[in-house]
Amino acid sequence: MSLESVKRNGHNLDLGQFELAGEYGIPQLQPVHLDERIQWIRFNHALKEQTRECLGVHFFIDDYLFLRVWNDPARYALFLRSFKAVMTPDFSLFADYSRAVQIYNHWRKHQLGAYWQRFGVKTIPSVSWADRDSYAWCFDGEPEGSTVAVSSVGTMKNKDSRRLFIDGYREMLIRLQPEKIIFFGDVPDECGGNIEHHAPYYETFTKELAFSAKER
């Protein structure tokens, strides 16, 4: 099936047949190994980039800023293939979302991720979770022994959300045993593993604004 043959539909059920994992039939991602450190840009800035072959694209931004990759999958799969690497879209799994919405967001992250991998996009799993109950499905479809990505942005605001993040992170280490964790945001002392730290997008955005003002 070519990129051009993929037609849009509301749930992207025509993107292909993939190996499925878990009770909810989550598309299985293949492990990806990214030994080198590269620069990551947020998706909503990727369209204007010219030197794409040396950059990575992340989706640790508000969902509305990247819904277009879901609404027009063939077009953006072709676009993302021009980058060095791409992370799976981080559809939100907020703890106050209904379980149905959480599982659907996890499923469509993997539906796109498996589709991208099939068409030659170097796709790194972005792993996320909600609460302890989400452990029953939120790691389904994630590869073991792979480079993965996580973000702590927004989880360090209070004791409860911080604990949810740390507990889920530890569970991820046990279940997936990632070879490297590309980590956006503050890294709590309790988080172990082979971490490659990156500043969150709002910090890099602030630096960009300051540099732009200085140039003027």
Language model features: what each stretch is:
Residues M1-P31, N194-R216:
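C-terminal accessory extensions appended to soluble enzyme cores
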Residues N44-Q50, G56-V57, V69-A213:
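Eukaryote-skewed repeat-based solenoidal scaffolds used as protein-protein interaction platforms
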